[in-house]
Curated annotation (Swiss-Prot):
Protein's name in the database: Molybdenum cofactor sulfurase
Lineage: Eukaryota, Metazoa, Ecdysozoa, Arthropoda, Hexapoda
Regions annotated as coiled coil: none
InterPro entries on file: Aminotrans_V_dom, MoCF_Sase_C, MoCo_sulfurase, MOCOS_middle, PyrdxlP-dep_Trfase, PyrdxlP-dep_Trfase_major, PyrdxlP-dep_Trfase_small, Pyrv_Knase-like_insert_dom_sf
Function: Sulfurates the molybdenum cofactor. Sulfation of molybdenum is essential for xanthine dehydrogenase (XDH) and aldehyde oxidase (ADO) enzymes in which molybdenum cofactor is liganded by 1 oxygen and 1 sulfur atom in active form.
Active site: 422
Originating organism: Drosophila willistoni (Fruit fly)
EC number(s) from the headed UniProt entry: 2.8.1.9
């Protein structure tokens, strides 16, 4: 047992018991929640209080009732108290979130004559967005070191020439805690900037470079993005006095969402003076409809900037958020350590423990499993918060894509964050991506923020982030460590297929000749009439302009109109469709073994009577006809859910020039049994093939050579290859039992050098492209040969 295993926990046994009782839903859902930097979890008593209050109280619009306004003002006072300040020093402007607070500063900060805008590279995307609307002389990006140098005595003495006053107001924005790595910026920097300016301007990004004053002719103001920091750390505005502080309360309490704040100091308030381009209700003394005259309120700062009606029902619930936090984690009566300081100690200890445990994970050849992304490690709580960012390495030193980690974690009931976390500057810094590589990633490869394009040329485009809250337990950390160890160190690494290990030229001549004479054939046809349900296997099947006839023509949606897939309900694989001359028959191969039949053909009157419904597949809108209450009740009964409906597509989507049914990407998905065989799973090969839910199954004799195809023919039908299929965690579901196992995903990633590609998407060539008559009925037939053009 390591020393860190024996650290004294921050919370007493009684406190931990009370905390656990507030988060019983985690155990009920078998969830391990490790994304507190995204949002923390709300205590169950918070939402219970909200329900009681909404049930019993009558809370009117604050523009109607002064009592509601007083209630909102109580929340303002509590916010100031929480951050150790008072109304004489700071004012609270409610916003939608921290991003909206940053926008407010960007819109209204008065840079004066020649003021500049400076921001730290490792900032949230919202800070980058400020650049689009500021009216500064120059915009500069500062590296973290250029700010931390202020603590080392490298100061600028502002001496005005001939006793003149400052010619501009410069604004410096940085995060109190980096939401990517958890690094904490020294808050002493705030006053040093305000008093002595910047020793380095940073890199000029836009505007005009100041070559004359070297920063001596500016007043400096600091905007502190405290959204990440304030969630798990004490922020004392009596000790550290930024001019602007941006907050999101859901990061502190989990509930309510949609409420943030901009705290403005008296000094900062003087600079929020740029003319408004818009005003809303509650912010003016008067306005004329017949003329442009209006006058803004000036009795208090927040009245000038809080447009319209505040989300007052959410704001009043903030009080219960403060109460819950202070009730569950009271100030330590023996040591005087405050609530938020105790939270800070708890999450830092967990982060340090996780780093210690992950450092011990190594492959047999000594290669560390984990690459960490932080500045100074986990030795000082004053410089590091409860966030651990990392990537997983392969045994050969390559990278495992973060999308795979997200899928494997999901299969283990662990919720964490992957990508760049809306902090592209930190992402570029930690992953050591130069500007040229950034262009490759975002402009040439087509990656966009939030997608799962995780490896490009073997290099990661993002990372994995784990973050903690006061309700996180040591057992949650252990579960993550065990998942990584089991998935990447303890599991059997699949061997390469012999055809790949031994080059073709090394085969005996007889086998070489035999291999050359063999042509791969279409072995199996699978049609999926109902999206995400079981396959209908056939030896021969007709084609339409959309692909295989009836393939993904029906879909099940929930009460919100969202498509139900096996990611949410694995029992869908137990619904076995079949089609006879006139009907679609659905059989549930579960407890009930019941079936239901639907007509394939409807009269015009029936079509007119059917309800029209809308949904989306891969962000493309689709429209369908509701198949009625009888089948809806059958689905509810067998799947154990409420409000399900069966839709039949009635309009065609368009992808490029090809029509699609309810498939995700292309008309057909093709899988090579040789590629499946190379995975070497212990289960029967047919079961593994079924996991990939392909329409066309071939066997080429060599794994993964289908990835080199650009076009192919099966019989007299010609196809072009759209590209490889990027797999998700649905392939981890056994299509015969509904059971999940992560081995499929992790094995594919290893074989594909960190990518999750398996199978290829193909599209039938149209008449324009291949002179084929799509109006003529064609069939695909098992046993037909496959020709690669």
């Amino acid at each position: 047992m390591s020393k860190l295993d024996m650290d004294t926990p921050e919370f007493s046994a009684n406190e931990q018991e009370l905390i656990d009782k507030e988060f019983t839903r985690l155990e009920r859902n078998q969830s391990t929640y490790l994304d507190h930097a995204g949002t923390t979890l709300y205590a169950e008593s918070q939402v219970a209080h909200a329900a009681v209050q909404l049930h019993h109280d009558v809370i009117s619009n604050p523009h109607t009732s002064r009592s509601t306004g007083d209630y909102v003002d109580q929340v303002r006072f509590k916010i100031l108290e929480f951050f150790h300040t008072q109304a004489e020093d700071y004012q609270v402007i409610f916003t939608a979130n921290a991003s909206a607070a940053l926008r407010l500063v960007a819109e209204h900060f008065d840079f004066g004559d020649k003021g500049n805008f400076h921001y730290c590279q490792e900032n949230h995307t919202s800070v980058l967005g400020m650049r689009q609307m500021i009216q500064a002389n120059g915009t500069y990006m500062l590296r973290r070191e250029e700010l931390s140098e202020l603590r080392e005595g490298h100061r600028v003495r502002r001496v005005m020439a001939n006793g003149s006053s400052s010619t501009g107001n410069s604004l410096v924005v940085f995060s109190a805690q980096c939401n990517f790595s958890g690094y904490k910026m020294p808050l002493e920097t705030i006053q040093l900037i305000q008093d002595d300016g910047l020793p380095h301007f940073g890199k000029l990004i836009a505007g005009q470079e100041d070559k004359e004053t070297n920063g001596t002719a500016y007043n400096y103001y600091v905007c502190l993005d405290a959204a990440s920091y304030a969630a798990t750390n004490p922020l004392d505005l009596q000790k550290y006095k930024p001019d602007f502080v941006c907050l999101s309360f859901y990061k502190i309490f989990g509930y309510p969402t949609g409420v943030g704040a901009l705290l403005v100091s008296r000094r900062g308030a003087e600079l929020l003076s740029r003319p408004r381009q818009f005003y809303g209700g509650g912010t003016i003394n008067y306005a004329y409809a017949h003329a442009m005259d209006y006058k803004l309120r000036n009795t208090s700062l927040h009245e000038r900037f809080e447009d319209g009606t505040l989300p007052f029902l959410s704001i009043v619930e903030l009080l219960e958020g403060f109460r819950s936090l202070e009730r569950l984690i009271p100030t330590n009566s023996n040591t005087g350590i405050s609530t938020m300081d105790r939270v800070s100690r708890h999450v830092f200890t967990l982060a340090r423990y996780l780093e210690n445990q992950l450092k011990q994970l190594k492959y047999a050849n000594g290669q560390p499993l984990i690459q960490f992304y932080n500045h100074q490690g986990y030795e000082q709580r004053s410089r590091q918060g409860g966030i651990v960012a990392f990537n997983v390495r392969t045994e050969s030193g390559g990278y495992v894509g973060f999308a795979e980690i997200a899928c494997v974690a999901s299969l283990h009931g662990i919720l964490l964050r992957t990508g760049c976390f809306c902090n592209v500057g930190a992402c570029q810094r930690y992953l050591q991506l130069d500007d040229q590589m950034m262009d490759v990633i975002y402009k040439r490869s087509g990656r966009i923020c939030g997608d799962y394009n995780d490896l490009i040329d073997g290099q990661p485009t993002g990372a994995v982030r784990v973050s903690f809250g006061y309700m996180t337990r040591t057992s949650d950390v252990r579960k993550l460590v065990e998942m990584l160890e089991k998935s990447y160190l303890s599991s059997r690494s699949p061997e390469r297929w012999r055809f790949i290990e031994k080059q073709a030229s090394q085969l005996p001549k007889a086998l070489q000749q035999r291999a050359q004479s063999l042509r791969p054939r279409l072995l199996e046809l699978a049609i999926f009439p109902v999206k995400s349900c079981a396959a209908l296997k056939a030896k021969k099947w007709p084609l339409t302009a959309q692909g295989l006839k009836y393939d993904r023509e029906w879909m099940i949606v929930d009460r919100n109109g969202l498509a139900l897939t096996q990611k949410r309900c694995t029992d869908l694989c137990l619904i076995q469709p079949s089609i006879d001359k006139d009907n679609l028959i659905l059989m549930f191969n579960g407890d009930t073994n019941s079936s239901i039949s639907l007509p394939l053909f409807l009269s015009d009157d029936d079509l007119q009577a059917a309800a029209r419904c809308r949904s989306k597949i891969c962000r493309q809108p689709i429209e369908g006809s509701d198949c009625g209450d009888q089948v809806a009740q059958w689905l509810d009964q067998n799947l154990g859910l409420d409000g399900l409906r069966l839709l039949r597509q009635s309009t065609q989507r368009s992808s490029s020039s090809h029509q699609l049914s309810l498939v995700n990407q292309a008309q057909f998905l093709l899988v090579n049994r040789s590629s499946v065989r190379s995975l070497q799973f212990e289960e029967p090969l047919d079961e593994t093939v079924d996991r990939f839910r392909a329409n066309l199954i071939i066997d080429t004799g060599a794994p993964f050579d289908e990835l080199d195809y650009t076009s192919l023919s099966i019989g007299r039908i010609h196809f072009k290859v759209e590209g490889p299929c990027q797999r998700c965690d649905m392939i981890c579901i056994n299509q015969r039992t509904g059971e999940r196992s992560p081995e499929t995903l992790t094995t594919i990633s290893r074989l594909q050098k960190g990518k999750m590609r398996f199978g290829i998407y193909i599209t039938r060539l149209t008449d324009k492209e291949d002179n084929a008559e799509l109006n003529e009925e064609y069939h695909l037939i098992c046993g037909e040969t496959l020709e690669v053009d």
